[in-house]
């Protein structure tokens, strides 16, 4: 979070699904603010829980916990918390929207994780494909060809993928919360 660069040395900064890994949003956004020249822009794709997320629903909470565990995330904020963090360090928030919620003839963002259709890529994401992968890794671990722990990593990633699919279907999570912000001109 501490970039070795002079203050006000960037004309623009963007982040695509990267700042979601920062446990302290104001700190990371503050560092971006420090680096930007006055009037410069910041574009962000952020993970966040949507307005449909119900913190009182045990099913929603389990999905969120699986997303955090599988994604290695300490927190997944809601959009209001993210917007507040940007404003708290001085940004003007020019535009925000959940690009995953846009209507139109598109494939849902989580569809590649479902494993539907007939292709090598979809087989890999299918229930059978994940079973084959885990059992192949088990055999490779037993033969000491793959390092110990590969199955555990695979299972954690599969847990996250399943949680992303369920969260996407329910509309309680988006990996595509778009923010366009600006450092005020002096």
Give names to the regions the model predicted.
Residues 1-13:
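A short acidic, Gly/Pro-enriched loop at the edge of an enzyme's catalytic core
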Residues 178:
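Short hydrophobic/aromatic beta-strand element in the GNAT-like acyltransferase core
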